Regions:
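Short, small/polar residue-rich loop motifs at catalytic or cofactor-binding pockets
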Residues: 312-316
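Cysteine-cluster motifs in flexible loop/terminal segments that predominantly coordinate metals
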Residues: 364-410
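Radical SAM/AdoMet-radical enzyme domain recognition
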Residues: 95-116, 122-253
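C-terminal accessory region of radical SAM enzymes
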Residues: 201, 255-301, 326-378
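A structural motif corresponding to the C-terminal lobe/cap of the Radical SAM core domain
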Residues: 227, 231, 246-273, 308-309, ...
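Short, basic/aromatic recognition patches
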Residues: 298-310
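Conserved alpha-helical substructure of the radical SAM core
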Residues: 2-13, 17, 31-164
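Short, acidic, Ser/Thr-enriched surface-loop or helix-capping motifs
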Residues: 227, 321-322
Length: 411
């Protein structure tokens, strides 16, 4: 599977909240320090089209779009959201359909496009897609497993102005990683691909999907990423969709989930990498709880990008487009809200009932609806949908009890 932001391998899920970045506007410091689109002076969703769209509709324009440009993949990862496999998939968007959709999207915004999969490097016209996104004012980045990166491909990335790729490493050793990824030798190939990309000046983000199988190895994978000289390290909390449904018993219990996020809060203080959890909206609650206990204010100067964004961005500033054109709030949110072959993305983004409900925090139910942190957390709507069948239900993997439910004043 590639890398994620709306999905860990498409999220900067890559799904990149998919970061390459789950971030809002006006936050340049960390991006400039660690490389990536913002270091090139690019401000997603900050152009005239986005400003005009927001003034007209009252809806934020999307700033990050994770786009599964193919589902074909050379690996068969145990946790894959897409359940991707090698070989052609019927109905994938053509180059002309992709261009038409880009034209529509840039009429309302200038986002980061996370080109993911599957393995996007298996798509023969990827550089035409990359160039078209650049020409239209967007910023393309790539979520890849890095096993196909050669000097020739890395040179193409540099020539076509790819500022960053995201790559998943789930274990610190080849035996464990290869078993999880379903391909002997892929650990060594991934590490080699990262090195090649770096030699050609392409920024690299390492993603790690955290399960019960590797939760005790997060520090080791972080240290490996540091040794490899990458720019960023993001941990992704498993959302059981796609092939990941087979890992339901490997998802961290809520208490361990919380412990990993608390560890991440402490570790990011000293990490030389841009380090953050993804698919973990609780982290933004934890930041504020810890900051209060430490007598700090959550400011951009103190916390960088983490002070400027919220947990779940699906439908708010982030969207996912599948290989066949289905539009979803993120790659894990298993519900089609429209298809770009039948309806422009801009209309789906504006008119979808689900998108508009996700933007209204007052509709959240249970603990999430009562929580004083709902504006900065919001719970994982994909996880709520997967576990309960209701995307507005309370986050099923959160241990926090809101102050109002404890009979206390809100913080």
């Amino acid at each position: 599977m590639a890398d994620s932001v709306g999905n860990p391998d498409a999220r900067p899920d890559l799904e990149l909240e998919e970061e390459f970045g789950s971030e809002d506007e006006g936050t340049l410091t960390e991006r400039q320090r660690h490389g990536g689109a913002r270091s090139m002076g690019f401000r997603p969703g900050g152009g005239e089209a986005a400003q005009a769209y927001e003034a007209k509709t009252g809806i934020k324009a999307p700033r990050i779009i994770a786009w599964e440009i193919t589902r074909s993949c050379n690996l068969s990862c145990a946790h894959c959201r897409a359940a991707a496999e090698f070989g052609a998939y019927a109905g994938e968007l053509s180059l002309e359909q992709i261009k038409a959709t880009v034209d529509d999207i840039v009429s309302i915004t200038n986002p980061i496009f996370i080109l993911t999969g599957g393995e996007p490097l298996m798509r023969p016209d990827i550089w035409e897609i990359v160039d078209y996104v650049h020409d239209k004012g967007g910023m393309p980045v790539i979520g890849t497993n890095a096993t196909l990166i050669t000097d020739e491909i890395a040179a193409q990335m540099a020539a076509h102005r790819i500022p960053r790729i995201s790559v998943s490493i789930d274990f610190p050793t080849a035996v464990e990683h290869d078993g999880f990824r379903g391909q002997p030798g892929c650990f060594d190939a991934t590490v080699e691909g990262i090195g090649i990309a770096k030699r050609h000046g392409v920024g690299v983000q390492v993603n790690m999907t955290v399960t019960t199988m590797n939760a005790d190895k997060v520090e080791e994978v972080h240290d490996l990423a540091e040794q490899l000289g990458v720019d960023a390290f993001h941990i992704f909390m498993l959302v059981p969709t796609g092939r990941g449904e087979d890992l339901l018993d490997k998802e961290l219990p809520p208490e361990e989930y919380e412990a990993v996020l608390e560890w991440a809060y402490e570790r990011q203080k000293t990490s030389p990498l841009h380090f953050k959890p993804t698919d973990a909206p609780h982290y933004y609650r934890i930041i504020r709880q810890k900051a209060k206990a430490e007598g700090k204010k959550v400011t951009r100067e103190e916390y960088g990008l983490d002070a400027m964004t919220r947990g779940c961005l699906g439908g708010i500033t982030f969207a996912f487009i599948s290989h066949v054109g289905d539009v979803q709030p993120c790659g894990y949110f298993d519900m089609q809200l429209g298809n770009v072959k039948e309806q422009p993305f801009s209309e789906i983004w504006t008119e979808s009932r689900v998108f508009n409900e996700l933007r209204d925090y007052s509709l959240l139910k249970g603990k999430c609806g009562a929580c004083e942190y709902k504006a900065v957390c919001g719970g994982c709507r994909a996880r709520a949908l997967s576990v309960t069948g209701d995307y507005l239900a309370e986050e099923p993997y959160c241990v926090y009890v809101p102050a109002s439910m404890r009979g206390e004043c809100e913080e």
